[in-house]
Amino acid sequence: MIFRSKAPLRLGFAGGGTDVSPYSDEYGGYVLNATVDMYAYCTIEVTNDNRVCFYAADREEIFEGNSLEEFELDGNLDLHKGIYNRVVKQFNHGRPLSFRMTTYSDAPAGSGLGSSSTMVVAILKGFVEWLNLPLGEYDVAHLAYEIERIDVGLSGGKQDQYAATFGGFNFIEFYKEDKVIVNPLRIKNWIINELENSMILYYTGVSRESAKIIDEQTKNTKEKNSRSLEAMHELKADALIMKEAILKGDLKTFAEYLGKSWEAKKRMASSISNSYLDKIYEVAIETGAYAGKVSGAGGGGFMMFIVDPTKKITVSRELNKMGGHTMNFHFVKHGTQGWRV
């Protein structure tokens, strides 16, 4: 038997960082994001040789071993192992499974599109299909969060898991005790078309480790760093304004607050921007972009810009001279999907 699954990556428009503890526990967080037609993919081929093989095709990393109740997390494909460990323990009565798994993603790790969390969701969805697990969207997203953040111990927020699971444009609220509310936004097609037409997605060519940035941000929150906290309060307020703007099709306000959000985000942690990203931003604005920001924790990965559609090619041409490259994309309405072959 073969089971396949995929989960969409997301663009973070506003509020990113307010979904990270301890901020979300103490103040509550708001995030506005949308999924795009770039995915994390998983294939599970069921075997009967009492072996497990994880193959991350895009990273050319492989792990093979005898089927065990639990694999040690030693730095080699820990996310894959962490998911396996949890699934075996929680849903298979501790009985080892035998299979070969292949995974890959349309975006590199460190892209700022939520690629690692989205991969966890895709792999989990594969197991849901195979083992027929009775898990709804909230269950899958929360389980993905627990595996990545608690079991495997990677720092980060919660928005990516929920975006990948639910799909579409979402306004997501985060509160203490792991309370999360996903509000799917009903955005008119003309607004989605206009936003798509007005957006440039630019890969800076620089991968980064979001965990380091998030650790600095968490430290600032715990120490009640006023500059960092005020910036996070501002990001949260901006998310509300941008939600209203996108629902009404007011892209002028949407762009204005996207730019404001980026300025606020840079105050959250010193590693969020750098001279290379600042230069890219400068070139985009000089050639006609209204505003922009980095998607995800910052430090590199993808940047997005809002431009007049008639200037899109001109701005893209200049950005492509900066060492990275623009990427075509479309927004998608569906979240993670799984099927058997």
Swiss-Prot record:
Binding sites annotated in the UniProt record for ATP: G110, S111, G112, L113, G114, S115, S116
Sites marked Transition state stabilizer: R10
Protein name: D-glycero-alpha-D-manno-heptose 7-phosphate kinase
Keywords: ATP-binding, Carbohydrate metabolism, Kinase, Magnesium, Metal-binding, Nucleotide-binding, Transferase
Residues binding Mg(2+), per UniProt: S116, E148
Catalysed reactions, as listed in the record: D-glycero-alpha-D-manno-heptose 7-phosphate + ATP = D-glycero-alpha-D-manno-heptose 1,7-bisphosphate + ADP + H(+)
Pathway entry: Nucleotide-sugar biosynthesis; GDP-D-glycero-alpha-D-manno-heptose biosynthesis; GDP-D-glycero-alpha-D-manno-heptose from D-glycero-alpha-D-manno-heptose 7-phosphate: step 1/3; Cell surface structure biogenesis; S-layer biogenesis
Entry superkingdom: Bacteria
One Gene Ontology term from the biological process aspect of the record: S-layer organization
GO molecular-function term, one example from the UniProt record: fucokinase activity
EC number of the protein: 2.7.1.168
Similarity comment text for this entry: Belongs to the GHMP kinase family.
